[in-house]
Amino acid sequence: MKFVATLIACGLSGLALAAPTATVDSLEKRGPNDAAFGYASLNGGTTGGAGGTTTTVSSYAAFTAAVSSDAKKVVYVSGPIKQSAKQVKVGSNTSIIGKDSTAVLEGFGLLVKEKSNVIIRNLGVKKVLAENGDAIGIQYSNNVWVDHVDVSSDRDHDKDYYDGLIDLTHAADYVTISNCYIHDHWKASLVGHSDNNGDEDTGHLRVTYANNYWSNINSRAPSLRFGTGHVYNSYFENVSDGINTRDGAQVLVESNQFVGSSKALYSTDAGYAVEKDNDFGGAKNTALKGTLTTVPYSYSLVGSSKVKSAVVGQAGQTLKF
């Protein structure tokens, strides 16, 4: 949507909610039936198409047909698929899994709208023109896990040539974005699309960003309105405007490292944050002090001094199925 604005665990768990330890848990899962962690683990959990039919696709036509229904299904993507087209609508109870690093969607993105229980994993999505929508858009939907994806465009064009990479809008809820490589883009990840949408969004937009590598981003890394965010174990490299909390959002920011940022963590229109063990790399935390000190799920922290080695080279489309 367009608006003016293998080391880390896929299932990091088992630690006390109030006092996660600064250790690395190497528990990365690689099976098609893995369940999500973070906010996507709540509200009944996110299992995607586990237990359903399995198919492998390698063409645009086969892909669009395979992901559309709400029946349980696991759809493997084999090789690159290139098509200039609007976002492909994804049905509920779906797992979309790239078989390896060649599984890249180019020119079109994915839309999860009014759906639930969706997993998008080990997939590349790149160079989706603004007229075709976001690379990954999540609207009016709950329980979505985006894991080990590589999303990008370029910064050779102006900021409106492409739209968002991963955008959550219209009361999307219980979402986890983990182990992703998010790079080479102007406006990366928007949570809450408008200052005027508080009536719909307040009480929703709960999202976890964990173990991600953000690189060469101008802004929205991420930008959160109204919702509740948890950003941890992530490495931010040459991200001009980083985490922007706004319009009453509450964000817990832990165990991250920033290099080359001008605004690492900041508020707009009364957004709030609590930060713990972050290396802002010379930039400042100017966010208003928040109240979100714990989250209702287990997780572990690697520590800001270890984030780069833990995330770079591991985040992104690095799995094989």
From Swiss-Prot:
Residues involved in Ca(2+) binding: 134, 163, 167
Subcellular location: Secreted
GO biological process: cell wall organization; pectin catabolic process
Glycosylation site residues: 93, 238
Coiled-coil spans in chain: none
Reactions mediated catalytically: Eliminative cleavage of (1->4)-alpha-D-galacturonan to give oligosaccharides with 4-deoxy-alpha-D-galact-4-enuronosyl groups at their non-reducing ends
Alphabetized SUPFAM superfamilies for the sequence: Pectin lyase-like (SSF51126)
Signal sequence bounds: 1-18
Matches recorded under InterPro entries: Pec_lyase (IPR002022), Pectin_lyas_fold (IPR012334), Pectin_lyase_fold/virulence (IPR011050), PEL (IPR045032)
E.C. designation(s): 4.2.2.2
Uppermost EC category: lyase
Gene3D superfamilies: Single-stranded right-handed beta-helix, Pectin lyase-like
Record keywords, A-Z: Calcium, Carbohydrate metabolism, Cell wall biogenesis/degradation, Glycoprotein, Lyase, Metal-binding, Polysaccharide degradation, Secreted, Signal
GO cellular component, one term: extracellular region
Cofactor(s) for this UniProt protein: Ca(2+)
Family, similarity comment: Belongs to the polysaccharide lyase 1 family.
Purpose: Pectinolytic enzyme consist of four classes of enzymes: pectin lyase, polygalacturonase, pectin methylesterase and rhamnogalacturonase. Among pectinolytic enzymes, pectin lyase is the most important in depolymerization of pectin, since it cleaves internal glycosidic bonds of highly methylated pectins. Favors pectate, the anion, over pectin, the methyl ester.
Record-given protein name: Probable pectate lyase A
Native organism: Neosartorya fischeri (strain ATCC 1020 / DSM 3700 / CBS 544.65 / FGSC A1164 / JCM 1740 / NRRL 181 / WB 181) (Aspergillus fischerianus)
Gene behind this protein: plyA
